């Protein structure tokens, strides 16, 4: 996918990985970058606008845990303004296994709902033009960090959902791939709660392992966007971008 002159919606585009990725996207010259985030950050929006004045940056407050109908309403506002959208990035995520329901709501249900909502505008069965979904999942969707089983399971669910959406592309016209960062130096991993307090030092122990910067992750994210490979399972770890070959242990046969 060519980012230049495209229209992109980025959910949680002002977070740790999100903000650096927004910067890299803006440098590539899209026509519009629409940022949806729970918390407004005027300074970050101003920085993005200054980075490339030719790009129109728009912000809308958005919490991915709202009902599906509210998400559809917001997307209608965006589509009415832009007419077309080329790429949806779902990047919302929390890491706190004390908040079981919210972890599932943000990391999984929110991704499902935003993707489902945009199908109203993209689905070729409804006369839509199709589109591309990039879902930020996690390497914990491959192999869990067992001290945070709720977080890990939510990311595995998001990965499975994304893979299924990709396989439906011939029906809907919507392609999809997953972005799976490894341990990245963000506020998210500096301090977080394990499930039932099974490992109070989990954040400290995790950061003893090799990590990557948000910039390294963002630069590889843009490479994945440009590759635009339907069904790809991208691992973004230690400053590298690698396509994962998923091992098939069972097939529904349908």
UniProtKB/Swiss-Prot annotation:
Source organism: Drosophila grimshawi
Residues binding NAD(+), per UniProt: 10-33
Keyword terms: NAD, Oxidoreductase
Positions of disulphide bridges: none
Subunit-level organization: Homodimer.
UniProt record, GO biological process: alcohol metabolic process
Enzyme class: oxidoreductase
Active site location: 151
Keyword NAD: yes
Catalyzed reactions per annotation: a primary alcohol + NAD(+) = an aldehyde + NADH + H(+); a secondary alcohol + NAD(+) = a ketone + NADH + H(+)
GO cellular component: cytoplasm
Gene: Adh
Family: Belongs to the short-chain dehydrogenases/reductases (SDR) family.
Protein name: Alcohol dehydrogenase
Pfam family for this entry, one: adh_short
EC number: 1.1.1.1
List of residues binding substrate: 138
GO molecular function: alcohol dehydrogenase (NAD+) activity
UniProt-listed InterPro entries: ADH_Drosophila-type, NAD(P)-bd_dom_sf, Sc_DH/Rdtase_CS, SDR_fam
